C-alpha cells in the first residue's frame, strides 16, 4: 500500500497590528480647504518562525500634503502568523508575497482609515490592491536584473 501524500495546509493563525503611527506636523492644515495629494507606499516582508510558521508584515504608509504643507503621515505594520504545512517549495514565495498580503490588506486599510479619522481628518479609504500582479511584476524585474548581472 502506497504511503499517503500529506495534504497541504495553509491557515492564518493570528493577525495583529505590529506597529502604527499618525504624525500631524502642524495644525495649520486644519485652517485650509481640504484638497490633499496622497503618496501611498506598500511593502511586505516575510520571516520564517519555525518549520511551518511564517510571520508576514504588510507595511502601508500614507503621506498627505495639503496646499504644499504636510498634513499627516500615517503608517501601519499589519502582521499575520501563517501556517504553511506541506506546501510545495515552489509555491511558498507566491503565497508569502501575494496571498498573505492580500489577506492582510483589508485589516491594514481599516487601521489606516481609523487613525486618520481619529486625527480629525476626513475618512480615507484605500483602493484595493492586486498583490498577485505586484508579485508577478517584482518576479519579472528580479529575473531581468539577474539576467543583466549575468
UniProtKB/Swiss-Prot annotation:
One of its GO terms (cellular component) is cytoplasm. InterPro entries: SecB (IPR003708), SecB-like_sf (IPR035958). It is found in: Cytoplasm. GO terms for molecular function: unfolded protein binding. One of the proteins required for the normal export of preproteins out of the cell cytoplasm. It is a molecular chaperone that binds to a subset of precursor proteins, maintaining them in a translocation-competent state. It also specifically binds to its receptor SecA. Homotetramer, a dimer of dimers. One homotetramer interacts with 1 SecA dimer. This is Protein-export protein SecB. It comes from Psychrobacter cryohalolentis (strain ATCC BAA-1226 / DSM 17306 / VKM B-2378 / K5).
